[in-house]
């Protein structure tokens, strides 16, 4: 419920028209409906959290509250980056850690707390979720440029059109020669353009600079960090099967989005 709250507000702020292959709430209804629906989901999420066992309630609510604040901070950074041309790789990784990764990390740690895990195992699960969350967002950046819209569930090139300072754009700006840098800046500063032309031009520069492979390499790096954290959790390997299946669903989005989303939901429900 909380995750859907963030998506409703995120789509509104980004003016995204499609989510999971369907029109977004503010497109079907209006902006006010999207804001109020998202707010209601946030309230419901906190209400559900109060159903935790009393002995864990304070620790769970503290972590959940911190997570929600961090996600707001990440979204604010994401919006600020759109008007900046000097965003660094480290700043971007920190932004996606806050905006995306801490939600998965916090969810896993809350589950560990409620299951009576040791503090060390709970922290290892948190780190597992955080690293997978970063890898997932890097993959999301990649799919926004190179994905199939039928599989991705969103229009391709949205990040390019709104000048999102993604890992790919940051790397391209750092690696570009004088001519490529000027071309990128021309598109970043253009006020009137054909969307398809801008997407094609920026993607071509990414291709020239091997940005796709660079992004995939960084994604695999965080995937490796995540699996190392999962390996450190002191439970039998067969008990980690569902988490490994979840990782496969998140990191290999090759099936239809609706089916992948359903399987991910079922996996989380049975953890």
Task: Give the location of each predicted region.
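Mobile late-domain/C-terminal helix-loop "cap" segments
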Residues: 176, 182-233
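Hydrophobic, well-ordered secondary-structure elements that form the walls
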Residues: 169, 226, 243
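Mg2+-dependent prenyl diphosphate-binding active-site environment of isoprenoid biosynthetic enzymes
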Residues: 1-181, 185, 221, 248-251
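Alpha-helical, largely C-terminal catalytic domains
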Residues: 103, 218, 233, 256-258
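Alpha-helical structural elements of signaling/regulatory helical domains
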Residues: 55-56, 116-120, 175-179, 193-194, ...
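Short, amphipathic C-terminal "tail helix"
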Residues: 222, 238-258
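Conserved small/polar residues in nucleotide/adenosyl-binding loops
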Residues: 260-270
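Generic leucine side-chain signal with a strong bias for well-ordered alpha-helical environments
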Residues: 7-8, 230, 243, 268-271
